[in-house]
Curated annotation (Swiss-Prot):
Cross-referenced PANTHER family: CALCIUM BINDING PROTEIN
Lineage: superkingdom: Eukaryota
Protein name in the entry: EF-hand calcium-binding domain-containing protein 11
GO molecular function (one): calcium ion binding
Calcium is among the record's keywords: yes
Length: 162
């Protein structure tokens, strides 16, 4: 039993028609020479336009590594796929934030074992106290008795990959 099994799954699904139109419009705006693809710099500008931040080198490298060797950039379909994945990751992170906030009833910015016990007693009342303690200890990365949002997010994502 791990935190991610409590139901925090990304909502996979197709982008709405209006979102897709917006993404295509941004792609076309950044593809100034109508090459049919976005260069690394074009891609970065497009991400700034859509998400409000410049992607890291690692993020840009990940997208550029999937580029067709016959072109010098990301095709429209590759761009749409990357943007969809990024949107889903953002939704999932927001969902994790909401779960953390629901656990943090005292608005301290961290969770204690008591917070875990209270939350799990509501969502899984038959769960043994030993299991709740194990989950808390696994989430408490530095064993300081507090689970920060970063600890919580890591635990949720770690549980997703199991």
């Amino acid at each position: 039993m791990f935190l991610s099994e409590a139901g925090a799954r990304p909502r996979a699904g197709e982008a709405s028609a209006s979102e897709r139109r917006k993404w295509v419009k941004v792609f076309k705006a950044c593809d100034e020479d109508n090459k049919g693809y976005l260069s690394r710099e074009d891609f970065k500008v497009a991400i700034v336009m859509l998400f409000g931040y410049k992607p890291s080198k690692i993020e840009a490298d990940a997208v550029m590594s999937s580029v067709n060797p016959n072109t010098s950039g990301v095709s429209l379909e590759g761009f749409l796929s990357a943007v969809k994945r990024k949107k889903e990751a953002r939704l999932y992170r927001n969902e994790i934030r909401q779960i953390f906030t629901a656990f943090d009833v005292h608005y301290r910015g961290f969770l204690t074992l008591e917070d875990f016990k209270r939350a799990f007693s509501r969502v899984a009342p038959k769960l043994p106290a030993r299991t709740v303690l194990e989950v808390f200890r696994e989430a408490d990365q530095d064993s300081d008795g507090h689970v920060s949002f970063r600890d919580f997010e890591y635990a949720m994502n770690h549980g997703q990959s199991k």
